[in-house]
Amino acid sequence: MNPAHLLILAAVCVSPLGASSNRPMPLNLYQFKNMVQCTVPNRSWWDFADYGCYCGRGGSGTPVDDLDRCCQVHDNCYGEAEKISRCWPYFKTYSYECSQGTLTCKGGNNACAAAVCDCDRLAAICFAGAPYNDNNYNIDLKARCQ
């Protein structure tokens, strides 16, 4: 790629990041957030971002409850999607629809997008069916997730 093009690309990508104090969210995680809000409208997305051993960054140990198990399954699903050539689940966008709490992954998604959409759809449905325990939010990972 031409060095001038790289410089322009870097400026376009970096300048919006410095304009905000909020860290940017990969596009797919934004879609996943919206899927969760579709199936669990009475809870904030952030309630799931630091829950148990698997909801949020990383994941290890035994899930603390059914909701945490949803996140473990979602992590594993992304791991399977990564086996598709050039598939990066955290950045792959897809087409889907939310209608009255029902999620549908639309046709026209390529293999990677279809897999990632299904991972997110199944996790959002799982979240809706699992009880939320406030005691499992922001837990001590070193003590409880070995």
Curated annotation (Swiss-Prot):
Tissues and organs where the protein is expressed, per its UniProt entry: Expressed by the venom gland.
GO MF, one example: phospholipid binding
InterPro entries to which the protein is assigned, alphabetical: PLipase_A2 (IPR001211), PLipase_A2_Asp_AS (IPR033112), PLipase_A2_dom (IPR016090), PLipase_A2_dom_sf (IPR036444), PLipase_A2_His_AS (IPR033113)
Substrates-to-products reaction catalysed: a 1,2-diacyl-sn-glycero-3-phosphocholine + H2O = a 1-acyl-sn-glycero-3-phosphocholine + a fatty acid + H(+)
UniProt keyword terms in alphabetical order: Calcium, Disulfide bond, Hydrolase, Lipid degradation, Lipid metabolism, Metal-binding, Secreted, Signal, Toxin
Disulphide-bridged cysteine pairs: C38-C98, C53-C145, C55-C71, C70-C126, C77-C119, C87-C112, C105-C117
Annotated SMART domains: PA2c
EC primary class: hydrolase
Residues that bind Ca(2+): Y54, G56, G58, D75
Record carries keyword Oxidoreductase: no
Active site per the UniProt annotation: H74, D120
Cofactor: Ca(2+)
Signal peptide residue numbers: 1-21
GO cellular component entries: extracellular region
Superkingdom per UniProt: Eukaryota
Compartments reported by the entry: Secreted
GO BP: arachidonate secretion; fatty acid biosynthetic process; lipid catabolic process; phospholipid metabolic process; positive regulation of fibroblast proliferation
Stored SUPFAM superfamilies: Phospholipase A2, PLA2 (SSF48619)
CDD domains listed in its UniProt record: PLA2c
EC identifiers of the protein: 3.1.1.4
Stored Pfam families: Phospholip_A2_1
Cofactor binding note from Swiss-Prot or TrEMBL: Binds 1 Ca(2+) ion.
Family of this protein: Belongs to the phospholipase A2 family. Group I subfamily. D49 sub-subfamily.
Function, in words: PLA2 catalyzes the calcium-dependent hydrolysis of the 2-acyl groups in 3-sn-phosphoglycerides.
Alphabetical list of PANTHER family matching this protein: PHOSPHOLIPASE A2, PHOSPHOLIPASE A2 FAMILY MEMBER
Protein name per UniProt: Acidic phospholipase A2 C
Organism: Naja sputatrix (Malayan spitting cobra)
